[in-house]
From Swiss-Prot:
The gene is ARD3. Keywords: Amino-acid biosynthesis, Cytoplasm, Dioxygenase, Iron, Metal-binding, Methionine biosynthesis, Nickel, Nucleus, Oxidoreductase. One of its GO terms (molecular function) is nickel cation binding. It comes from Arabidopsis thaliana. Catalyzes 2 different reactions between oxygen and the acireductone 1,2-dihydroxy-3-keto-5-methylthiopentene (DHK-MTPene) depending upon the metal bound in the active site. Fe-containing acireductone dioxygenase (Fe-ARD) produces formate and 2-keto-4-methylthiobutyrate (KMTB), the alpha-ketoacid precursor of methionine in the methionine recycle pathway. Ni-containing acireductone dioxygenase (Ni-ARD) produces methylthiopropionate, carbon monoxide and formate, and does not lie on the methionine recycle pathway. This is Acireductone dioxygenase 3.
Length: 199
């Protein structure tokens, strides 16, 4: 069953290199010509991904297995849209500030869609479009940012190991141990190493 879920990831999670345009952050920002990345290439940066059944998350055995194997004991939901989030425009701009966390950021899109932008090894931005059913894990120490897309709506399950800690450290915070560990594990790694994107 897990293989079927894994094989359909590209339908709910897509990644591409971004252009340098200053246009609205909610636009796709494709390069011309478009330059897509595989989810396995994303995994080389530590970004893991799954496709799950968002309509049945309460009883989904695959989600339960992932939570148990990775120790995700706490869960809540975050809805990002003008109607549900106070100070919506201010919040959306703050989410788009480049930052890192000292813990993994786990997000499972159960409705809507949004963009998670991550830096590659050469500091280029990769845009990761997560739609309903897509779950991603951003490793501790990776510089990233988030924005809704032009639909202005995402409902995401947030998962944590233990008590929820969501402290953003805006760039630069290269001195943090989580950043140094990220660089050692994913930036300085042997280019020949292969990492499974749904590990």
């Amino acid at each position: 069953m897990g293989e079927v879920v894994k094989d359909g990831r590209e339908e709910v999670i897509q990644a591409w290199y971004m252009d340098d345009s200053e246009e609205d952050q909610r636009l796709p920002h494709h390069k011309d010509p478009k330059e897509f990345l595989s989810l396995d290439k994303l995994a080389e940066l530590g970004v893991l991904s799954w496709r799950l059944d968002a309509d049945n998350y309460e009883t989904d055995e695959d989600l339960k297995k992932i939570r148990e194997s990775r120790g995700y004991s706490y869960m809540d939901f975050c809805e990002v849209c003008p109607e549900k989030l106070p100070n919506y425009e201010v919040k959306v701009k703050s989410f788009f500030e480049e930052h890192l966390h000292t813990d993994e950021e786990i997000r499972y899109c159960v409705a809507g869609s949004g963009y998670f932008d991550v830096r590659d090894r050469n500091e280029a931005w990769i845009r990761v479009w997560v739609k309903k059913g897509g779950m991603i894990v951003l490793p501790a120490g990776i510089y990233h940012r988030f924005t809704v897309d032009s639909d202005n709506y995402i409902k995401a399950m947030r998962l944590f190991v233990g008590e929820p800690v969501w402290t953003p450290y805006n760039r630069p915070h290269d001195h943090l141990p989580a950043r140094k560990e990220y660089i050692d594990n994913f930036v300085k790694v042997n280019e020949g190493g292969v990492i499974d994107a749904s590990a």
